[in-house]
Regions:
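Membrane-water interface segments that mark the loop-to-transmembrane alpha-helix transition
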Residues: 15-28, 54, 63-114, 290-316
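Transmembrane helical elements of multi-pass membrane transporters/channels
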Residues: 16-32, 163-164, 168, 189-201, ...
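Helix-loop junctions and terminal segments of transmembrane helices
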Residues: 66-82, 263-267, 271-292, 362
């Protein structure tokens, strides 16, 4: 017999804000694809290469380091809101943490800037400067998103996603129509767009917080260090492909970096379907976790993994069947069926690994998840180095191997934790989402 509470869990509508955030994600994804198209029309594949590298480098570093800060801020603010307490002291604490992380990252970028300019950005120092500027744009961007989610302002959260992508595309289009054919202005468009989103949300008074009791760092997850390591490693892995091609390509193969980046974008389409599935199913799992119902948690998790696996399989089959003609239509091709299929396979395996990683974190396995992503990154480096002399194939093999290694580690960790009777933690789902730093 099913209790009323169980029935309400099964029949519960989508959680508040799902539609707003979903629309924002959709706009963010579409504008990213169009940005790559317009940028290549303006600069050509070779000229657009520094922008491709900037894109994947920025979205490895910024969400990797600051998504956990955003999610922990949101969790702490939501907890205070439930207690009818103001969250400004929490914001101040998280601002201190974000500033410290930003200072460390800034120091590293400044030290590495001559090397980055020479080896990655084709001698364009302004592109390196854009990567540094990204810090000053994305730190407040993630804090604003944390305020929005923790305060229940999901329309504002969706606006940050949509406006960020729209502003970037609008700036790129204006530059193209104006005949600008230097990478510098396009690089600045990539990293300054979040400031537009921040300004719009601030103008709507959606960044306000109220004064409240003093905040201690104990209000932040005690596992923030492991979360941060896992987030950085996971973001590095999902963005490693084009960066790996760039490192291995010679001076005559710059266009191949752009072409590979196009393929990676196309292969990530299932990841955005995953985010929609996640938005629909994870809140129900969180409610089951709050009840401490391990049996129903297992059933809900099984459903999530089946759906995610189905999306991964369909994405890989779709890439095999339709990938080359779609790439020809949108980006004038450049990749064969093997490459786009292996990229989709790697993306699909990564997606399943990500879903399991979130469950492991919900079972308080933060350290295991950090270990899994770090081992995956190590596997990528080893396999890419020794697997083949073919530029694309060695990176494709590295991505598939890395995602598979992470998946195996997470699967074994999940089985071990559940066999040991570890109870899921509702707050862990917030941490789990922080371990998913995705960007088109």
């Amino acid at each position: 017999m099913v209790s009323n509470s169980d029935a309400s869990l099964n029949k519960a509508p989508l959680p508040e804000g799902t539609l707003s955030v979903g629309v924002g994600l959709f706009i963010s994804g579409i504008t990213a694809y169009v940005f790559f198209k317009v940028g290549q029309e303006a600069l050509g594949k070779e000229g657009f290469k520094p922008i491709v590298v900037l894109w994947f480098a920025a979205f490895a570093l910024m969400p990797g380091f600051f998504m956990p800060v955003e999610q922990e801020l949101g969790r702490a603010l939501a907890h205070r809101r439930a207690l009818d307490q103001g969250g400004r002291p929490v914001l101040v604490r998280m601002l201190m943490l974000a500033t410290g992380l930003g200072a460390l990252l800034l120091t590293g970028l400044l030290i590495a800037s001559p090397w980055l300019t020479r080896e990655f950005f084709e001698g364009y120092g302004i592109v390196t400067l854009a990567l540094i500027i990204a810090l000053f744009a994305y730190v407040p961007f993630h804090l604003v998103r944390g305020i929005a989610s923790g305060s229940g302002r999901f329309v504002a959260y969706g606006l940050t996603l949509g406006i960020d992508g729209t502003a970037r595309l609008a700036a790129c289009t204006v530059l193209w129509l104006a005949g600008i054919d230097s990478p510098g202005p396009y690089a600045l468009a990539v990293v300054l767009a979040p400031i537009v989103a921040i300004a719009v949300v601030a103008a709507r008074h959606e960044t306000r917080t109220d004064d409240g009791p003093p905040a201690e760092f104990s209000e932040v997850s005690g596992n923030l260090g492991w979360l941060l390591l896992g987030s950085v490693m996971g973001a590095a892995l999902v963005n490693a492909g084009p960066l790996g091609v760039d490192v291995l390509a010679d001076s005559t193969e710059t266009a191949k970096v752009t072409v590979f980046g196009n393929g990676v974008l196309l292969a990530r389409v299932p990841l955005f379907l995953f985010q929609a599935v996640q938005a629909a199913l994870l809140p129900r799992l969180a409610r089951l976790a709050a009840k401490g119902d391990l049996d129903e948690f297992r059933e809900g998790l099984s459903l999530l993994l089946k759906v995610v696996a189905a999306v991964a399989v369909l994405g890989t089959i779709g890439a095999f069947a339709l990938g080359p003609p779609v790439l020809d239509l949108v980006y004038e091709g450049g990749l064969d069926r093997r490459t786009i299929t292996l990229l989709a396979l790697a993306s699909g395996v990564y997606m399943v690994a990500l879903a399991i990683a979130q469950a492991v974190i919900a079972l308080r396995g933060h350290r295991l998840v950090a270990l899994g992503w770090a081992t995956g990154v190590a596997a990528f480096l080893v396999v890419t180095a020794v697997s083949s002399d073919d530029l694309y194939l060695r990176v494709e093999a590295g991505l598939v191997a890395a995602s598979t290694v992470a998946l195996v580690i997470f699967g074994m960790s999940l089985r071990s934790l559940m066999s040991a009777g570890h109870a899921p933690d509702a707050d862990g789902f917030s941490d789990g989402i922080a371990d998913a730093p995705l960007k088109p």
